Amino acid sequence: MAATEAVHHIHLQNFSRSLLETLNGQRLGGHFCDVTVRIREASLRAHRCVLAAGSPFFQDKLLLGHSEIRVPPVVPAQTVRQLVEFLYSGSLVVAQGEALQVLTAASVLRIQTVIDECTQIIARARVPNTPAPAPLPPPVPPPLAPAQLRHRLRHLLAARPPGHPNAAHSRKQRQPARLQLPAPPAPIKAEGPDAEPALTAAPEDRGEEDDDEETDEETDAEEGEGGGGGPGEGQAPPAFPDCAGGFLTTAADSAREDPPASTGITDYGGAGRDFLRGTGVTEDVFPDSYVSAWHEESSGGPESCPVETSAPPDCALAGPRPTGVKTPGPPVALFPFHLGAPGPPAPTPPTPSGPAPAPPPTFYPTLQPDAAPSAQLGETQAVPAAPAAQATAISGTPVRAPGGQGAEQPAYECSHCRKTFSSRKNYTKHMFIHSGEKPHQCAVCWRSFSLRDYLLKHMVTHTGVRAFQCAVCAKRFTQKSSLNVHMRTHRPERAPCPACGKVFSHRALLERHLAAHPAP
């Protein structure tokens, strides 16, 4: 019987990667490229086997025998070029502002891995960072009576064994945490000769002050407060940071006095001595008036605690606007990702009581003063327009309002339905309704649209990005209209049915219910 022949397995770790790198080098050199990808006016050469393996869009085109593939012009050519390079290299660098364009291009080419990654990038960027739950404050023990305080301190001071002067700093015999005090930091004087001393803020107050953006003068004042640390200028902060708002600040002025006479209590060195000095220790560690001063510490005067003033209102919403200046609208994006409920509307600019100011310079040609008024501009009297002005208005030229009252707004009139528009962009969009032209086509389902904006909104149905979130229940939707319908469920007012008592969130739903309701 013949011996079993040995079998050797040869496995190269990075063979696939090196093969793609070789193909990418051939593509850059223009060797063996058998397909052309065109996007707008740009074009690039590639290998059909790589494109078909990485993109179902290219695979469907190549199965039909196309040697030249034209990508729908919904995204820039540079974005498509990046995705083609991704098919060769497997790596893609996406900036935060370009994630939406890359997502749209990947949806057209149906590259699912890029769609998933860009969806996560957009979701992380659009969702507001939920603040971490604030840590629970440490339990504050109930205030003790003066006699109990004296007994507690005597017990702590007597816990030190005799004959060990440095036992408080020993690692084997540790004293309570409040008696192991580090050396006080070097005093830092407040900046400037006119800086007023103030008490050191508590750690939690210091954290709240750091969250607010203040001016340079206020920042310098906070640095002075952090360095001052005591009631006097240039004085070292108290040795007990946990007791900064407690009993040490009530008798900090007595820290400069001489040490009291010995009362039989074991003398401590270093921080322990400063601790006993700062509280003015006698035979009774704390006087009877100590408790009232402790409780009144939180209700300090306006000089001891700086009062934070609220930030001034936004300059875009405060004060009247000059006549003729339009309120800036929301930022325009490829997909309008507006999370939560919409913001408050901008206030209406007040009408000036004096004479109307001169209208701002316009870039539209001056027309006859008796031009036909627009129904959407708010005029009540109609002045007969000249034939030349009517012909100009029908052709889409701006029409001015009669008279010189207020700012002159241009208007465009549709020659088919006589509808007027205040901007050329809206007028151009409206003309697609009458022409029936739909030049923008979805590369996934081949549905056509008259405007590129409609195509971009339609692409959300393929990408699955739920960019619109309810501010009440955090539910997400793909379209703004779906969010608006959902917001009706959170309205406090309800429309009850008089017959069966069923409530509805909208009166239209109630009317539909009443129409289908059986007659009594």
Curated annotation (Swiss-Prot):
Biased composition (Pro residues): 342-363
Domain BTB residues, every copy: 33-96
UniProt entry tagged with the keyword Cytoplasm: no
Transmembrane intervals: none
Region Disordered: start-end pairs: 182-272, 337-372
A cellular-component GO term for this protein: nucleus
General function of this protein: May be involved in transcriptional regulation. In the central nervous system, may play a role in glial cell differentiation.
Annotated protein name in UniProt: Zinc finger and BTB domain-containing protein 45
Natural source organism: Mus musculus
